Amino acid sequence: MQETRKIALIIGGSRGIGRGVALRLARAGFDLWLTYKGNHTAAEAVRAEVETLGGACELIPFDVSSYAEVEAALAERMENTSPDVLVYNSGITRDNLLMWMSREEWDAVLSTNLDGFFNVTRQVVFAMLKAKRGRIVVISSTSGQVGQAGQVNYSASKAGLIGAAKALAREVGKKGIVVNVVAPGFIETDMTAALPKAQVLPLVPLNRLGTVEDVASVVHFLCTEPNMYIHGQVIGINGGLVM
């Protein structure tokens, strides 16, 4: 009898860290439900890579900030199937000093990064509780641990994710669901491409930017290690930037 492949739901999986996590889990034998908002070309490219690795990848487009869109996309899928893993990786920036920040810049970041977590995870937790198993990994940021000038909105959203994940871990741990947070620092992605390395690297004791694979390897461990005893924790991947 062929063993049923596990399913990983990757929220925000078409580029950057999400793409790296998707490919790492596909190599580990997971089939994927991969969500994205607008970049269909990038999402299709990830699906093609996953299929090359021998896995299946279902693309699910929606805006995480819309509860109605999330519910319409996920509720029916999860009536009879629970994903084994949820990786919440949705995140945007609208950087500005608070004194100049518009309400739109604040709302856009909080609704995508933090409200989106509620919109998605509420759907998934019901299914995981019914299945009495699951792994949830939330991608936060060092900005949510120490704050960054010019990122009051982003830092608030990422700190909120840490608090939400810790509270959720207390709610569902006894039901067989393991919840953890990964907090990357400066990782080489589109989001950090404009950073001046000459100014950034002196802040990092390991003297390099992180790679997507640095993050993906930790997420893979949290999603696959049997008898996991790491629960409700924030794992920094930052080269020593935050200790």
Residue spans for each PLM region:
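Conserved glycine-rich cofactor-binding loop
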Residues: 14-16
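Short, small/polar-rich loop/turn modules that mediate ligand/substrate recognition or access, typified
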Residues: 173, 178, 230-232
